[in-house]
Amino acid sequence: MAEDKSKRDSIEMSMKGCQTNNGFVHNEDILEQTPDPGSSTDNLKHSTRGILGSQEPDFKGVQPYAGMPKEVLFQFSGQARYRIPREILFWLTVASVLVLIAATIAIIALSPKCLDWWQEGPMYQIYPRSFKDSNKDGNGDLKGIQDKLDYITALNIKTVWITSFYKSSLKDFRYGVEDFREVDPIFGTMEDFENLVAAIHDKGLKLIIDFIPNHTSDKHIWFQLSRTRTGKYTDYYIWHDCTHENGKTIPPNNWLSVYGNSSWHFDEVRNQCYFHQFMKEQPDLNFRNPDVQEEIKEILRFWLTKGVDGFSLDAVKFLLEAKHLRDEIQVNKTQIPDTVTQYSELYHDFTTTQVGMHDIVRSFRQTMDQYSTEPGRYRFMGTEAYAESIDRTVMYYGLPFIQEADFPFNNYLSMLDTVSGNSVYEVITSWMENMPEGKWPNWMIGGPDSSRLTSRLGNQYVNVMNMLLFTLPGTPITYYGEEIGMGNIVAANLNESYDINTLRSKSPMQWDNSSNAGFSEASNTWLPTNSDYHTVNVDVQKTQPRSALKLYQDLSLLHANELLLNRGWFCHLRNDSHYVVYTRELDGIDRIFIVVLNFGESTLLNLHNMISGLPAKMRIRLSTNSADKGSKVDTSGIFLDKGEGLIFEHNTKNLLHRQTAFRDRCFVSNRACYSSVLNILYTSC
């Protein structure tokens, strides 16, 4: 009976097209039963005969494997040997994801803000008329700058800063702007500017440009409309009635121009006097007029749309004047008022840094913020307020919750006419002590409005000043030519007659020893080149291992690669009339840099007595004398030549900023600690 039943089942399955589930198992225990050896062969034959039904198999009706039924799948998956590993893997995955999320949140919360592009490396300031002439007309231009971008990148520069190139009159070195939206033909075309922006960005660099909001040229269309009282332009400038006595114009008050004499000039067209803080060809805009403020913001938007990465706002302390017309107070009160003609003879309490001026500057910052939303496209804003006291200058950083300038340009080192360890220390500490907490410092040793370093202090101080520049905390800023030690030009007959002192610092860049120092192929250049260009030029110094250019490149590279320099603490050790000594250090890095700079005559320094735990000998990481690089010197008797600088590297865990004795002598902008295990910075030190 059993055999007949088996046959019937097999026949039925064949008739159904062999839709069998060969993976089906009634009971797991059946698989573990040992078959009867005696019946194995018979059962196999019977089964084969029952299923196939003939000698030759017929697969025509066979369908694909249908899979395990749901009920069976649940039965298997519910068994302990499958369920437990599955649950373990699931909860391990959940735990891993939660750990990763928590770690990510912790890293973000504890990590300091990454340095922005304007903090990461040096800025290079270019006076475009003197950098490189591309069209043989004797004037530097925008194409010339583009041609020299490879040189700039070789210096490890991160930001190119170009001074005024707007369409302007020749007065005051192109700072009397006729059209803020046009490139002066001397420098090229708007297409040249756009190509320059693209080339700078292709090199991974950023571009900031000068912008002078305080005044325009008297040839500007706004002024022409204002002097004829045309519509809204009537009050775009500062106009007041003047009186006339014996054919002489009597101004409204005793306010003086920066260049001397009255800051009021009578205009015959309007029959009134207009106010000018600078030259009479540069009338001051009326920033108490909201339309003027909006016009300036529109100009900022125009250049931001062109792709510039930021602005240097010049002469911002002059934006507002007092509403009243009271006389400013004389420095020498016994001086006869009619003889007061020089700017330095008055206290300028009514014509500079007026209430509301910082609000205007903040509004410029807000305009730039509208273009700073894309990652990596933050728009920088710096301010120039020349000859301000440090406590007033740092006010341009803004308030804790109201941002203003990213930093006001710090030109106080470039104002030193004599140098010593004491004077350098005073400039450094004055800035760091007055700078608001959490703000970023910057340093300049030269600029277009000051005498060049070599001529001001002496050629022997070029290298040590550049070493100072790159080892101080913050952004180093270099005026073109300072990297090779260019000096002022000495010429009896200059092409243009303005302030001779500042004109001499704008001489053509010295590229090589060919005609015109490689600056131009023209027969005449707008200013003569310095007579020392045969020996002081880029090509010569490229091949000299001990040149100023080679040291500059080494310093720039060290600054870029060392967290101690670009993120670390600055701790002052000692200074006197000769030298200044300080350290750069960072929590988590068990070594420090000890910087020793001599600004006086030759001297002997005992460094071992300044810092406890110093070894008898210490290795020089970098020196103004390249022959000393890598050597070890006796720390108890370090001989320093005039203008010599040394950077020592010392392995220690005893950092100075943690010590009570140095607590008031250490500064840091944004506190950070380094984890060598994770290779990250964090703030919870």
UniProtKB/Swiss-Prot annotation:
The chain crosses the membrane at residues 88-108. The keyword Transmembrane helix applies. Changing V183A: In CSNU; uncertain significance; impairs protein stability and dimer formation. Residues 1-11 have a biased composition (Basic and acidic residues). Expressed in the brush border membrane in the kidney (at protein level). Predominantly expressed in the kidney, small intestine and pancreas. Weakly expressed in liver. It comes from the Eukaryota. Changing I445T: In CSNU; uncertain significance. Residues 1-87 are cytoplasmic. Residues 1-56 are annotated as: Disordered. Disulfide bonds join C242-C273, C571-C666, C673-C685. Ca(2+) binds at N214, D284, F318, L319, E321. GO terms for cellular component: apical plasma membrane; brush border membrane; extracellular exosome; membrane; plasma membrane; vacuolar membrane. Gene3D superfamilies: Glycosidases, Golgi alpha-mannosidase II, Oligo-1,6-glucosidase, Domain 2. The modification Phosphoserine is found at S10. Keywords: Amino-acid transport, Cell membrane, Cystinuria, Disease variant, Disulfide bond, Glycoprotein, Membrane, Phosphoprotein, Signal-anchor, Transmembrane, Transmembrane helix, Transport. Signal peptide: none annotated. One of its GO terms (molecular function) is basic amino acid transmembrane transporter activity. It is a single-pass type II membrane protein. Changing L346P: In CSNU; uncertain significance. PANTHER family: ALPHA-AMYLASE FAMILY MEMBER, NEUTRAL AND BASIC AMINO ACID TRANSPORT PROTEIN RBAT. Acts as a chaperone that facilitates biogenesis and trafficking of functional transporter heteromers to the plasma membrane. Associates with SLC7A9 to form a functional transporter complex that mediates the electrogenic exchange between cationic amino acids and neutral amino acids, with a stoichiometry of 1:1. SLC7A9-SLC3A1 transporter has system b(0,+)-like activity with high affinity for extracellular cationic amino acids and L-cystine and lower affinity for intracellular neutral amino acids. This is Amino acid transporter heavy chain SLC3A1. It comes from Homo sapiens (Human).
